[in-house]
Amino acid sequence: MNTANNTLPTAADWAGEDGAPDAADTRKIERESHKLEKRLCREVGRAITDFNMIEEGDKIMVCMSGGKDSYTLLDILRKLQKRAPVKFDIVAVNLDQKQPGFPEHVLPDYFKSIGVQYHIENQDTYSVVKRVVPEGKTTCSLCSRLRRAILYKVADDLGCTKLALGHHRDDIVATLMLNMFYGGRMKGMPPKLVSDDGKHVVIRPLCYVPEKDTARWAQYQQFPIIPCNLCGSQDGLQRVAVNEMLREWDKKFPGRIESMLRAMGHVVTTHLMDPHLHDFKNAKATGIADPNGDMAFDHEEFPVAPALPGLQVVQLG
């Protein structure tokens, strides 16, 4: 455990079907589940370390929607809590927005079954949104703002130092693409940020985790999933289209989504076009060699993407 002299913990410190399956199938499922658990703990631990998400004495408010991602986040954080190099508390929080058909017993029953501290906040934002937003318009934007304000207040009331959200790797890359395609800006989801009111720290411990892993873990653990579209509103067709594009891309070109995520952490501001990040107007030749300077006329070489299985070209002779 690497906590001496206020040294930040390392990633190693953190990561310390139908019908009844037969014995062989059961063993295979157990092996796959164990491997996935280790991978999830490793990736979440790495994110916590890389961005100093959780510190000694923190009280983490895990925002629970009842979807696969928030269940996975809570489960993995509780596993890490038992062997983490720092001591921290967890409280699971759900905002019941009084959407018609919301199964309000599901989350409290689950929280009680695992013995986690929890809080259910009852606020009828559904009626507010329906009253304010014209019929046929998406309610997601207003609903999100109301939810954010309420959760910040709950964090204050509970004495929480951090709010943990369940956004995963694919959410972050999709948001970057959405902003590029429809917003004309390069903006994704940060792994850690100070809230817009300046009073709260928000963390995304699943930022390195692909969605397929949270889906698989939810399946293994048989979490009581609550549908995400009870209100009948959808967050526009743009996100649906981008998510589908990324899924197809990942099938055809494995590893590209991971590469895009890495790119968000390796930004070369001199090779973009934002004058606020680089002073292009006053760029002048100095006569001094710069190893980081632009090779303006050179063709940039990129690593060859791995071919899909079965598509490799075999050369004979």
UniProtKB/Swiss-Prot annotation:
<feature type="binding site">
    <location>
        <position position="231"/>
    </location>
    <ligand>
        <name>[4Fe-4S] cluster</name>
    </ligand>
</feature>
<keyword id="KW-0411">Iron-sulfur</keyword>
<keyword id="KW-0819">tRNA processing</keyword>
<keyword id="KW-0004">4Fe-4S</keyword>
<keyword id="KW-0460">Magnesium</keyword>
<keyword id="KW-0547">Nucleotide-binding</keyword>
<feature type="short sequence motif" description="PP-loop motif">
    <location>
        <begin position="65"/>
        <end position="70"/>
    </location>
</feature>
<comment type="pathway">
    <text>tRNA modification.</text>
</comment>
<comment type="function">
    <text>Catalyzes the ATP-dependent 2-thiolation of cytidine in position 32 of tRNA, to form 2-thiocytidine (s(2)C32). The sulfur atoms are provided by the cysteine/cysteine desulfurase (IscS) system.</text>
</comment>
<keyword id="KW-0963">Cytoplasm</keyword>
<dbReference type="InterPro" id="IPR014729">
    <property type="entry name" value="Rossmann-like_a/b/a_fold"/>
</dbReference>
<comment type="similarity">
    <text>Belongs to the TtcA family.</text>
</comment>
<keyword id="KW-0694">RNA-binding</keyword>
<keyword id="KW-0408">Iron</keyword>
<keyword id="KW-0067">ATP-binding</keyword>
<comment type="subunit">
    <text>Homodimer.</text>
</comment>
<feature type="region of interest" description="Disordered">
    <location>
        <begin position="1"/>
        <end position="29"/>
    </location>
</feature>
<dbReference type="GO" id="GO:0000287">
    <property type="term" value="F:magnesium ion binding"/>
</dbReference>
<dbReference type="GO" id="GO:0051539">
    <property type="term" value="F:4 iron, 4 sulfur cluster binding"/>
</dbReference>
<feature type="binding site">
    <location>
        <position position="140"/>
    </location>
    <ligand>
        <name>[4Fe-4S] cluster</name>
    </ligand>
</feature>
<dbReference type="GO" id="GO:0000049">
    <property type="term" value="F:tRNA binding"/>
</dbReference>
<keyword id="KW-0479">Metal-binding</keyword>
<dbReference type="GO" id="GO:0005524">
    <property type="term" value="F:ATP binding"/>
</dbReference>
<dbReference type="GO" id="GO:0016783">
    <property type="term" value="F:sulfurtransferase activity"/>
</dbReference>
<dbReference type="GO" id="GO:0034227">
    <property type="term" value="P:tRNA thio-modification"/>
</dbReference>
<dbReference type="InterPro" id="IPR012089">
    <property type="entry name" value="tRNA_Cyd_32_2_STrfase"/>
</dbReference>
<feature type="binding site">
    <location>
        <position position="143"/>
    </location>
    <ligand>
        <name>[4Fe-4S] cluster</name>
    </ligand>
</feature>
<dbReference type="InterPro" id="IPR011063">
    <property type="entry name" value="TilS/TtcA_N"/>
</dbReference>
<keyword id="KW-0808">Transferase</keyword>
<protein>
    <recommendedName>
        <fullName>tRNA-cytidine(32) 2-sulfurtransferase</fullName>
        <ecNumber>2.8.1.-</ecNumber>
    </recommendedName>
</protein>
<keyword id="KW-0820">tRNA-binding</keyword>
<dbReference type="Pfam" id="PF01171">
    <property type="entry name" value="ATP_bind_3"/>
</dbReference>
<dbReference type="GO" id="GO:0005737">
    <property type="term" value="C:cytoplasm"/>
</dbReference>
